[in-house]
Curated annotation (Swiss-Prot):
A family per Pfam: LpxK
Species assigned in the record: Aliivibrio fischeri (strain ATCC 700601 / ES114) (Vibrio fischeri)
Keyword Nucleotide-binding: yes
This protein's UniProt keywords: ATP-binding, Kinase, Lipid A biosynthesis, Lipid biosynthesis, Lipid metabolism, Nucleotide-binding, Transferase
Name the record gives this protein: Tetraacyldisaccharide 4'-kinase
One BP term from GO: lipid A biosynthetic process
Enzyme class name: transferase
Binding positions for ATP per the UniProt entry: 59-66
HAMAP family assigned: LpxK (MF_00409)
Family in the record: Belongs to the LpxK family.
Length: 328
């Protein structure tokens, strides 16, 4: 319901205005003061000895940051660089922090997105509630670059390159701060970053257009790959920032979806609640982010759909050149 207020001009927004506006103003004041304290030196920030690239956004919810992080890691790896990824590890509870992921780390330890990034890229991935602590851990691994998954507003960590990922269809909603609107920072922040990435929709001036390109569906148990359109009676579910985006992708791929179910972002699934979805169809299809949480109890009729960030060739080269220049 809150997203309908933020993005769809729902009438409840007007009814709740007297309650939400003061909270929104307080959020803005705290966020602005916190940023000012770090920029003025009143609060100390950490400067890494390794170039730091921040991939974040100014709105709450999923905008497609993780595919951008994966793309950056893979591109830099292809140039021979060793890359580390720092994350807050939301949704996980590690035995200690900072925590360096291994090939066997599970989402309940580190959170779902760090596991996805580790599995896709084999990069060094570290998590800590204070991102600068994760960065320090990665420095010890001898990485050439550190990319932070989210953390644009974590001003306790200095950075060399900043990306803002924008949902090209929903944009910035009603342009109010949380909780009246989706903003973590004001739209004026857009003018101060190195790259604005527009995920879907129509990119605007000074924005780099990005598309999430789906590949074949992959079976969670066997690893078999099949085209989505060849799968029948699919039940689709997603526990991501904006589930309708996943369902729309399936529709574009002409998937035979008979039921959809959205869950909150970073949800820790119980086997029974996923198994119950099977009553609506013959097979399940989910996002890659959800698959890392369901892998341990997956059934042979469960599939996931990986997506890859794609950019115009010229823009992709500009992005890489800018990052590599920092190192040189």
């Amino acid at each position: 319901m809150i997203e309908k207020i933020w993005f769809d001009n729902h009438f409840l927004g007007k009814l709740l205005w007297p309650l939400l506006w003061p909270l929104s103003y307080l959020f803005k004041w705290i966020a602005t003061k916190r940023k000012s304290d770090y920029q003025s030196g009143k609060k100390q920030s950490y400067r890494s000895s390794v170039p730091v690239v921040v991939v974040g956004n100014i709105t709450a919810g999923g905008n497609g940051k993780t595919p951008v992080v994966v793309w950056l890691v893979e591109q830099l790896q292809s140039k021979g660089y060793k890359v580390g990824v720092a994350s807050r590890g939301y949704g996980g509870k590690a035995p200690h922090y900072p925590y360096l992921l291994t090939e066997t780390t599970t989402p309940d330890i580190s959170g779902d997105e760090p596991v996805l990034i580790k599995q896709r890229t084999k990069a060094e991935v570290a998590v800590a509630p204070v991102r600068s602590e994760a960065v320090k851990m990665l420095e010890q691994q001898g990485v050439d670059f550190i990319i932070t998954d989210d953390g644009l507003q974590h001003y306790a960590l200095q950075r060399d390159i900043e990306f803002i990922v924008i949902d090209g269809k929903r944009r910035f909603g009603n342009q109010h701060y949380i909780p009246l609107g989706p903003l973590r920072e004001g739209v004026e922040r857009l003018s101060s970053v190195d790259f604005l990435i527009c995920n879907g929709g129509e990119s605007q001036e000074n924005e780099v257009s990005m598309r999430l390109q789906p590949s074949e569906a992959i079976n969670l148990v066997t690893g078999e790959r099949r085209s989505v359109s060849s799968l029948s009676n699919l039940v689709a579910f997603a526990g991501i920032g904006h589930p309708p985006r996943f369902f729309e992708t399936l529709n574009q791929l002409k998937a035979n979806v008979v039921h959809t179910q959205g869950f909150e972002d970073h949800k820790a699934f119980e086997p029974t609640e996923i198994e119950q979805l099977m009553q609506y169809g013959e097979q399940l299809i989910m996002t890659e982010k959800d698959a890392v949480k369901c892998q341990s109890f997956a059934q042979s009729s469960w599939w996931y759909l990986p997506v890859d960030a794609t950019f115009p060739k010229e823009k992709a080269q500009q992005i890489l050149n800018k990052i590599i220049e920092v190192k040189e």
